[in-house]
Amino acid sequence: MRTICYKTVNGINLLGDFYSASNTNSPVIVYIHGGGFIFGSRKEILQEQVKQYNQAGFHVFSIDYRLAPETKLSAIIEDVRDALRWVCDQAPSMLDIEPSAIAVIGSSAGGYLALLAGSKESYVKAVVSFYGYGDIRGEWASEPSPFYLQKTIVPKKLADQLITKEILTESSIQQRFGLYLYYRQQGSWIRETTGLDPIQNKEELRLLCPIECVDHSSPLLCSYMGKQIMMFPVKNLYVWRNG
C-alpha cells in the first residue's frame, strides 16, 4: 500500500491509499468512504474488499476528502472530482494504471459522492453506489428523523464541542457520530453540511442531487440498496430505473 497526496488546499494535504493489483496498466477503482459527510476515513475500506478487487485485476485508490460542517458539500464534491482528475491525469505515469478504465465506488455518503462526481466525468467508465443518496431535498434529509429520534438525544452543547476551527480530512465515527446524530435529530443536516436553506435554495440543492444530474451521457451506473434501510427512503432511486 502506498499513501499519496492527490491535492493540497489551504496547506492541507488530501491523501489517498493506493493498493496495487499484480498486473501493470490495470483499471483502477476510486473508493469513497461514507460518514454522512461528517466523519470517516480512507482507511475504512475493508482489507477483504481490497483483496477481492485486486484479485479481480483492479488497482484501488481509497481517498480522504474534507469533512463537513467545517467544509461545505460543494467543496467536498470538488475534492472528489479533483481526485478523479488526478487519477486520470497524474497517476498513469506514477502507478501503472490504465487511465481509460476508471470506476468509482462508494457507500452511503460515499455512494452519493460517487454518483454525483462520477456521473459527469467522461473518463469514468462505471459508478457503483452502495446505499447512496439519490436526492437530498426530501423531508427525510431536512426534517427531524424519526429513525434517529429513537436514539439518545444529543444536547446542543455537546454537538457544538465536536465542531472544530480546523479543516478536517478524516475523523472516526466514535469522534463525530454525535454531531451527525444531532443534526439528524434536529432536522438541520442538509443546512449544516451544504450551507443552503432547503426552502430558499431549492435550485442550488437540485444541482446537488444525483437524480437530477444523471443523463444518457453518464457512465454505467449501479446502485444497490437494502430492503430494510431505515435512514432514508429507497424510492428516489427508482427514478433512474424508470426514467
Label for each model-derived stretch:
Residues 130-212:
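Accessory cap/linker subdomain of secreted extracellular hydrolases
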Residues 217, 222-225:
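Short beta-strand/loop motif that positions the catalytic acidic residue
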Residues 28, 54-61:
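A fold-wide structural signal in alpha/beta-hydrolase
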Residues 5-8, 41-49, 61-103:
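Catalytic nucleophile-loop/oxyanion-hole region of alpha/beta-hydrolase
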Residues 82-157, 202-205:
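Primarily recognizes the serine-hydrolase "nucleophile elbow" in alpha/beta-hydrolase
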Residues 1-24, 77:
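N-terminal cap/lid segment of alpha/beta-hydrolase-fold proteins
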